């Protein structure tokens, strides 16, 4: 996935990037994902069986990390509202998402506003690629990926976030492919119902 993303983003001079993740790290995250999902490449179900240890270990670490976890948002006039949303929507299910983060090597919480309030998208390490950092190590640009299959087609959305001063510029691009080896042809984001909002 990393190579396909890099190739697509570097086709256009407006989006030239140097992905801040090595292909080796991307391969490791893919391996950790496969191991967690009980699809490790060395398991053949006949001679080599899985003990499902990656999922068990990630679950136990997440349990220990969140067992007595207390967290809240304080300060400012909007803190009470934000804390209420945070308690209901983030902390309520935090153990499950910490488990995914432990299993795959990372997790990003991406809040956004909906008609009914705040919502949180939990982006796992295999769907997030940092593109640029500042001198203090803060992410300045990244790409989030979302992918799904419908029939024989694979749809992919790249959501590039670029920090520009105090604002974030978000660019969405959509692609459709018939194989796992490339992102395929670029299509309008509005051509896909779930992304047309």
Task: Please place each PLM-identified region on the residue numbering.
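Extended, helix-rich architectural segments
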Residues: 1-121
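Structured, contiguous alpha/beta core segments that scaffold functional sites
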Residues: 7-10, 98-197
